[in-house]
Amino acid sequence: QGIFIMVTEQDIHFMRYAMKLAARGTGWVNPNPLVGAVIVRDGRIIAEGWHERYGGLHAERNAFKNCQEDTVGATMYVTLEPCCHYGKTPPCTEAVVEHGIARVVVGLTDPNPSVAGQGIGILREAGIDVEVGVCSEELKAQNRVFLKYIQNRMPWVVMKSAMTLDGKIAAYSGDSKWVTGGPARMRVQEMRRTYMGIMVGSGTVVADNPMLNCRLEGEVRQPVRIVVDSGARVGMDSKLVTTAVTYRTIVAHIATADPDKLRMLSACGVETLLCREQNGHVDCVDMLSKLGGMGIDSIFLEGGGQLNETFLRNGLIDEVYAFVAPKLVGGKEAKTPVEGQGFARMSEAVELKNVEVEMVGKDVLIHGLIER
């Protein structure tokens, strides 16, 4: 069963449409997957739905809720295998069977070990014709955050940097306002909305005193602000600490941090996260594992060169966005996106795959995934 997939152009068309619907959940459903569903009868869409926010109805149930027509004998396209367990919501397989759906076209099997293939099995036992794997590569790319998180319980890490044409993230004086233009900075706000956590090192907090919130108009889910700060040096008067009651803020530190300072931070609403120590600094692998355990499935790394270098050296970066501004600032003391000693040979350089390049205002945005 399922070996000879009878996939038509129509199947691909409707699955891609379901994928577009799924994307509407971006920034709202984490750590759940992005899922879209479409109900089709005689080549015509009669209902659609997507997973809109965490804890809300799944895509399939939203589609049924939105449906004004008879679903008996119809086909459902869903980007991810319907769930078959009672979680925050009842299983979707029940709804599919109850509504008399005759054929289900599934994009991806659920990578969650508690589900994997069981939902499809239940549908087939109920006499429903199930096709699996339509547009699966595109869907894996769309749900790359969820796929890594559900399999490893480790957050997906995206490194963002903005640099001049000669690779500087600030002038030698430390001044960095602004490397890129308004459209690029606006794009960064869009990106911040997408991920569950924004991360910087203590050096960035001292140098820039950032807010690290998402400043888009309208309703957005604010990311958790995370500072990698071994000695808990972050200033009590910094924006991150003074706004911690409003925006969830975590300071990751090691055991040698001053306990009085940690108590003061806690009193201001900052969550303190004790991590293992590695060479006098926070062990980033341990920190990511702990953040994953807290339900944080993705990190937008906006750190300085030191933190970026630690992540890169430990193979912790999954994806890169690099904004390059058409300007030269010079200076051998001027900071670069990745500091440290670096690799000795070009053959050791970390390469990107699936590279995309676009103009954002006057700046160039290079985006790619890290070769694994």
Regions found by a protein language model. Give the residues of each.
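A short, flexible N-terminal coil/short beta segment enriched in small residues
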Residues: 18-22, 42-49, 138-151, 241-245, ...
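Zn2+-dependent cytidine deaminase-like catalytic core
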Residues: 39-139, 224, 250, 257, ...
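Enzymes that bind and transform nitrogen-containing heteroaromatic metabolites
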Residues: 7-17, 21-25, 30-32, 71, ...
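Helix-turn-helix
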Residues: 36
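Short capping loops/turns at secondary-structure boundaries
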Residues: 112-116, 132, 150-154, 177-181
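Proteins enriched for Cys/Gly/acidic motifs involved in redox and nucleic-acid/cofactor modification
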Residues: 27-29, 56, 120, 134-162
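Short, well-ordered coil/turn segments that N-cap beta-strands
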Residues: 102, 128, 153-155, 196
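Short, Lys/Arg-enriched N-terminal segments with co-localized hydrophobic residues
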Residues: 1-5
